[in-house]
């Protein structure tokens, strides 16, 4: 019999490894049962930097601040990745998602979900998460449960190619990835907990940093002409 828990963890480790290897290494986790494979994969990755924020609404705004910081510190800006469990937890992200959309700030939303057979039957903490954020996200990617994915590394590479393009748009914004997990959520055999993933090669060459402004020329211009300096978002 196939160990669904081992498949869940291995798939999550592959996904987190792929994200980190593309330079997306900041995670904000709101702990919950259904998202355990994702949270554990982040905690085990030595290149991942993560914060644990119990309240999902607060976590989303904290992640928003992290993404805003990258606008001035990296070129291009890189997304902060949010992780939470299923149900109403996901809905608590909405205010920050709206702000990220209008401020053009990159966020990657990884929501754990119940499998399809637990929808529309009154299961606990089960809502229609696909399309929950509507027009406030640049894209939504509903995925099948990991135990239904035949070639996980190949499919994750294909997904990351799409995500990387979408996350580095000229007008970035939030992207939603919805991931249903079947139980058991973790491996039945303890030795399966030690599984690790091979690194993923960069999907795109890194962009050169933005050139620094010519402050001397700017100073001469200001000295010889009357002008107005505007600071802040336009």
Label the predicted regions.
Residues 2-234:
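N-terminal alpha/beta PP-like core and its mobile active-site loop of ThDP/TPP-dependent enzymes
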């Amino acid at each position: 019999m196939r160990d669904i828990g081992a498949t869940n963890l291995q798939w999550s480790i592959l996904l987190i490894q792929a994200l980190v290897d593309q330079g997306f290494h900041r995670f904000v986790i709101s702990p919950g049962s259904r998202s355990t494979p994702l949270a554990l994969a982040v905690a085990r990755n030595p290149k991942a930097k993560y914060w644990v924020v119990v309240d999902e609404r607060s976590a989303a705004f904290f992640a928003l601040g992290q993404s805003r910081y990258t606008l001035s510190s990296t070129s291009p800006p890189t997304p902060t990745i949010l992780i939470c469990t299923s149900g109403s937890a996901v809905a608590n992200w909405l205010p920050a998602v709206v702000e990220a959309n209008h401020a053009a700030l990159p966020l990657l939303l990884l929501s754990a979900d119940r499998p399809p057979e637990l929808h529309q039957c009154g299961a606990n903490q089960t809502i229609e998460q696909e399309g929950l954020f509507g027009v406030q996200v640049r894209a939504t990617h509903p995925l099948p449960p990991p135990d239904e994915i035949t070639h996980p590394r190949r499919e994750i590479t294909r997904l990351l190619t799409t995500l990387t393009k979408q996350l580095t748009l000229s007008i970035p914004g939030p992207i939603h990835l919805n991931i249903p997990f079947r139980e058991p959520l973790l491996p039945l055999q303890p030795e399966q907990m030690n599984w690790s993933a091979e690194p993923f090669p960069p999907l795109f060459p890194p962009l050169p940093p933005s050139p620094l402004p010519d402050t001397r020329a700017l100073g001469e211009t200001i000295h010889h002409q009357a002008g107005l300096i505007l600071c802040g978002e336009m």
